[in-house]
Amino acid sequence: MSERRNAWPPLVYEDLAPLVGYVNRLVQVAGKYTLDEPFEVGWGNVVLDVTPRGLKTPTLRQRGVTFSVHYRLLDGDVVIEADVGSRTVPLSKGSVATFYAAFCDAAAELGIHRPRTLLICEIPDCAPTFEDDHVERSWDPGAALLMWEALNLAADGLETWQAPFLGHRPRVGVMWGGFDLSATRHRVQPTEPPPARPTFMQNAQLEAYVAVGFSFGDATAPSIGMYAYIWPQPDGLEGRYWGVDGAVWNADAGLVLLPWDKLRKATDPHQAIVAFGDAVYDAAVELAGWPSDLIGPRVNGWYMSRTPPEAVRAQHH
């Protein structure tokens, strides 16, 4: 791992919040296209990938055109790439409404229909639609770099944690509504979603899962860092050790929280994310009856390409 990837920068909520709020709104524009895709349990179909430059939709297919949308945080633009060509929309000073109009014009030039809804979701006190959001916002390249660095580092750790799980696991990525980076492990165990929650949230909780992720926080909880929870929530979460010094159970939030400042001061922050996730899964095994044999070897591809199956089984089972 390079020195740059080893550098875990300090993150201050107040410094990043304006751009995080702006980007959260912008990614919902292309994010709406993922709702046209087949539903994957846990909303795995809406995940945005963390790329070397920013955030990107999966490959999307409409009648007559195949495309993806890349929010290039490090370049300050959005690239719509299709089989018939590409278009670039700059992310300079402006409003969400202005961006939405420019995006739809660029998409139309490639034969891509506009998103089927204009609604902005999961952002408290926001304008109802993209066209209604006329607040002038600035693009801050420094904040964009910090956002990408945090997402990239956290994704690296979460992917390492997630890799050995043998059950269903959507790819690690950003959920464009709540704008958190998420890794979830699922099992076939029907559950009863909370009736008071929005429909899309209820349908995310039809089966049991374990979630570990990263969040930039919000106005009600202005703290950047890792989070985790077990659905349904079991008893006995209080007073446990969560694999990393500084990780604590927050009963009010229903989350295990690992603040970024605590994480970056760990001897090995990458490994600390893995240990954090492992501790949460161990709690699911001990308190919620999750199977312990759903975890395979945590090794790289070279190991699995050269090690006989009987040796893999002997060492990891």
Mark where each language-model region is.
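Short conserved micro-motifs at the rims of enzyme active sites and ligand-binding pockets
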Residues: 59-61, 237-243, 268-272
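Aromatic/basic-lined ligand-recognition segments
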Residues: 131-218
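N-terminal ordered "arm"
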Residues: 2-66
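Low-complexity, glycine/alanine/valine/leucine- and proline-rich hydrophobic stretches
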Residues: 207-257
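TerminUS-proximal long segments
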Residues: 1, 249-317
